[in-house]
């Protein structure tokens, strides 16, 4: 029957159209998914770049701060090195028959940070204005009484009195804090004619000083 055949044809064509629509819909969904995925990836990449830039900027600030701190520490070290003044000196050989106001040359230098003590003259010369601590120990042998003085710019600052009149060895120490100007000189001298000859200074004697601030 022709009519039946036509009806049968219509009945068989319907599924083909449905499959085609489903294919188109799937293709559309895939395109949309790709677009969404591309948008998501782009967003994540932008976010990652932003985070990296922020992290880099933060690190840059930290690095700059570290450089500044290192520079300040370097300046402090250089300041300390240039302002750290200290010395300690002894005698290589004993000194005998020291004359009045004669300088005792402590020629065996243990420490001389800042090079302010001059072994050739026996004088300490202040490299800058400040407060300085000085200590002097004088030892003398039997039958000798010896008076020494710490001179600051040729004026007595303190006296050291060593007495070995009834001892094999007599020692005395004294110390002082003085305020010095740059260029002021400090030395240990025989205190006039006071004492009992032979005015002998033992090698155990010392002259020490350092800058407080």
Swiss-Prot record:
Organs and tissues of expression: Pallium, gill and liver.
Name of a matching Pfam family: C1q
Superkingdom assignment: Eukaryota
SUPFAM superfamilies per the UniProt record, alphabetical: TNF-like (SSF49842)
Record key words, sorted: Cadmium, Copper, Metal-binding, Secreted, Zinc
GO CC terms, sorted: extracellular region
Domain C1q: 80-213
Subcellular location field: Secreted
InterPro entries, sorted: C1q_dom, Collagen/C1q_domain, Tumour_necrosis_fac-like_dom
Keyword Nucleotide-binding: no
GO molecular function annotation: metal ion binding
Entries under PANTHER family matching the protein: COMPLEMENT C1Q TUMOR NECROSIS FACTOR-RELATED PROTEIN 2-LIKE, EMILIN ELASTIN MICROFIBRIL INTERFACE-LOCATED PROTEIN ELASTIN MICROFIBRIL INTERFACER
Main function: Binds heavy metals. May function as a carrier of divalent cations in plasma.
Name of the protein in question: Heavy metal-binding protein HIP
Source species of the chain: Mytilus edulis (Blue mussel)
């Amino acid at each position: 029957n022709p009519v039946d055949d036509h009806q049968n044809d219509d009945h068989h064509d319907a599924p083909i159209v449905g499959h085609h629509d489903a294919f188109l819909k799937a293709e559309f969904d895939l395109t949309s998914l790709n677009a969404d995925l591309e948008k998501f990836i782009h967003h994540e990449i932008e976010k990652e770049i932003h985070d990296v830039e922020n992290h880099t900027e933060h690190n840059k600030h930290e690095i700059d701060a570290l450089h500044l701190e290192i520079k300040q520490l370097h300046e402090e070290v250089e300041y300390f090195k240039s302002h750290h003044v200290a010395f300690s000196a002894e005698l290589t050989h004993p000194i005998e028959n020291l004359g009045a106001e004669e300088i005792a040359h402590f020629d065996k230098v243990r420490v001389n940070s800042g090079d302010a003590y001059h072994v050739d003259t026996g004088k300490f010369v202040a490299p800058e204005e400040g407060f300085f601590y000085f200590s002097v120990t004088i030892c003398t042998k039997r039958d000798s009484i010896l008076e020494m003085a710490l001179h600051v710019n040729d004026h007595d600052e303190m006296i050291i009195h060593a007495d070995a009149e009834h001892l094999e060895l007599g020692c005395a120490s004294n110390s002082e804090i003085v305020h010095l100007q740059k260029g002021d000189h400090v030395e240990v001298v025989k205190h006039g004619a006071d004492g009992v000859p032979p005015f002998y200074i033992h090698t155990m004697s010392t002259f020490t000083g350092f800058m407080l601030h």
